[in-house]
């Protein structure tokens, strides 16, 4: 029952929705919030608000360096990007398993 106690311990952390991760990956891939919004069918404003909540409320870490319309990932953002890609890949596998 070690797994149950581990899950209970981890449940105190905030959760991150897969749609937020998908948006985060789109920003990294597209290099900006507007193009990422087009990819995930959201407005630039909605994408911006999602990422602000992720940075400030959930992770309490800066994920992006913003230079005008250009966006680059911080070192913390690079780490999250690797995890996000893996999580989304696993999520897709789970949903496609019969």
Q: Model-derived features: where do they sit?
A:
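Alpha-helical linker/hinge and terminal dimerization helices associated
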Residues: 57-58, 80-98
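Residues in the recognition helix of alpha-helical DNA-binding motifs
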Residues: 50
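Short alpha-helical elements of helix-turn-helix
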Residues: 10-30, 78-81, 85
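A short LG(V/I)-centered, amphipathic sequence patch enriched
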Residues: 55-73
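Short helix-boundary/capping micro-motifs
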Residues: 25-41
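Short, Lys/Arg-enriched N-terminal segment that forms or immediately precedes the first helix
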Residues: 1-12
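Alpha-helical residues within the helix-turn-helix
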Residues: 38-39, 56, 78
